Amino acid sequence: MQLSSLSHTSITHKDKKKKMGIELQNHQSHHEEASPAEEPMSRWLINTPEPPSMWQELIGYIRTNVLAKKKHKRNKTKNSSSNLVYSCLKSAFPILSWGRQYKLNLFKKDLMAGLTLASLCIPQSIGYANLAGLDPEYGLYTSVVPPLIYSTMGTSRELAIGPVAVVSLLLSSMVRDLQDPVTDPIAYRKIVFTVTFFAGAFQAIFGLFRLGFLVDFLSHAALVGFMAGAAIVIGLQQLKGLFGLTHFTNKTDVVSVLSSVFHSLHHPWQPLNFVIGSSFLIFILLARFIGKRNNKLFWIPAMAPLISVVLATLIVYLSNAESRGVKIVKHIKPGFNQLSVNQLQFKSPHLGQIAKIGLISAIIALTEAIAVGRSFATIKGYRLDGNKEMMAMGFMNIAGSLSSCYVATGSFSRTAVNFSAGCETVVSNIVMAITVMISLEVLTRFLYFTPTAILASIILSALPGLIDVSGALHIWKLDKLDFLVLIAAFFGVLFASVEIGLLLAVGISFARIMLSSIRPSIEALGRLSKTDIFGDINQYPMANKTAGLLTLRISSPLLCFANANFIRDRILNSVQEIEGEENEQEVLKENGLQVVILDMSCVMGVDTSGVFALEELHQELASNDIRLVIASPRWRVLHKLKRAKLDEKIKTENIYMTVGEAVDIYVRARSTSHELC
């Protein structure tokens, strides 16, 4: 872009600009020759040392984050090796820290909470295992080992660990593409265990190397949309159990599921399944309504699923309803978790896809668990350690994969029950796990006659908690682009697949970040009266602009190849507009634009393209007798300018520590020039 064609001012006007420039330089030179006590702040800026190199930063990051150790008060004598080992163990296993202060009155509360939690966990675990395409006992296994591991390593006091609906659906939909659970359930189960191992490994790596920011790529809006879409898909999947359908699709999109239901209803089906399932669904929802109306009756909705299972099983057993077409769970293998080390498929031809499913499962499970844990930690007034949570989740899933468990995480519905039941520590998880372990040994024969319709009704009753309508409305009011991410995740899961919904949500989130980085705003600044504060003149219309000055702020944290040309053109366009106004208003010629001050306080980094753009901007402005002044450059930005010798081209006297300093020097020089005239 050329500005010279727009600067059709008189020779007198250009001479005045040149004279003003000389006066400003003379004023700056005089200021530089002042006594040390009056040394300008810009000198402090120019003489700053070099910032740490990339390698020094990397080493510093590893020292402070990866190899970080808590500072302990040191006595005159060095700590013994045993104390050091104990300190490391306490850091890895928080139970060693609070376990010493654990008292009987706390155990009474945790015992009641754990038993209440188990009453909800047992029927839900069986249902979620069915949703994941596994036999019922594997859901119960997942409610034993992972909670026990988490109770020693986790930092949340309320988080209830076990299988959850969303992760179960995720595994079912993605692993099914590699192996059909109907044709070869053993091969399917082996892949699920291997996915669980990779999920745990990724979670442990995230915690070990402080990579928790990766979980943040799934924004709150994306999570709300994903959960809502998954809840509807899960609900539609339960129509198979609720109606007792035999022919049903393996796909998860809403069109395929509804089409399958429509065609299946044309085949013979037994309405008794629907009667049993819908009756107990109404009972569970009614119990939940009572619990919400009176918090003291929290145990009613918590016990309702287990009561439903017991009653439905007795009804089916006593009435011989199986002979009338009611589908039942049938055989549940009794006994404790069996080792599954030899079932992990590390030599599978699908190992890459298995690892990918493990990564997606790890992120979804972590996001849900940390979100739930933090919300209840905030209520209780303590801080959740995100990195320790990742480590705990990782090791519990690795251990789970070796003991016939699939991916476990924190459940919102069970955590809410645990909280309402008055839990004080993670001992409630231990009580729950022991109770489930006993039920595996004692109750499996009784559960043989449990109707599948009751499991479907239990899962359906838990789904409303996954649909956050008020949260979606809040996002709509707050940020329309965030709502677009929510809608993309919701409809992607609903009409395509779980992975497509995730990809759409993450893709739109990235596109939004890229758009804001590539097309940042350039703000024109003015000074607020009687202050040294400079604000956007659009946000603060009362801000005063200084004649002959154009102060602009780059709002992007990076001046790089993606936005350098755009930023340069925007700045030149702003100058062009002012030059055009000067040509139209002859009165303003003697106060024409002489200096462009570029506030770079928001710019954290600059690359080669950014440096070239600044150099081109300087040359373009200089050809029109306009000086480029840089204010508030960050340490690394200034270092890059020095390395490129751009500070010599712009001249160091045109680099200032603050916008206020640059404006004040210009105003003083201008007043001096007028006095000389």
From Swiss-Prot:
Name of the protein described by the UniProt record: Sulfate transporter 2.2
UniProt note on tissues of expression: Expressed in the phloem in roots and in the phloem of vascular bundles in leaves.
Residues glycosylated per entry: N250, N418
Residue ranges that the UniProt entry lists as topological domain Extracellular: 132-133, 180-190, 235-270, 318-352, 411-422, 468-482
PANTHER family per UniProt: SULFATE TRANSPORTER (PTHR11814)
Job description of the protein: Low-affinity H(+)/sulfate cotransporter that may be involved in the distribution of sulfate from vascular bundles to the palisade cells of the leaves. Plays a central role in the regulation of sulfate assimilation.
Stretches in topological domain Cytoplasmic: 1-110, 155-158, 212-213, 292-296, 374-389, 444-446, 504-677
Main subcellular location of this protein, as a coarse class: membrane
Signal peptide: none
Entry's induction text: In leaves by sulfate starvation. Up-regulated after treatment with zeatin, an exogenous cytokinin.
GO molecular function: secondary active sulfate transmembrane transporter activity; sulfate transmembrane transporter activity; symporter activity
GO annotation, cellular component aspect: membrane
Similarity comment text for this entry: Belongs to the SLC26A/SulP transporter (TC 2.A.53) family.
Organism: Arabidopsis thaliana
Membrane-crossing segments per the record: 111-131, 134-154, 159-179, 191-211, 214-234, 271-291, 297-317, 353-373, 390-410, 423-443, 447-467, 483-503
Gene behind the chain: SULTR2;2
Pfam families on file: STAS, Sulfate_transp
Keyword line: Glycoprotein, Membrane, Sulfate transport, Symport, Transmembrane, Transmembrane helix, Transport
Membrane disposition: Multi-pass membrane protein
Swiss-Prot/TrEMBL GO biological process terms: sulfate transmembrane transport
Ranges for domain STAS: 540-666
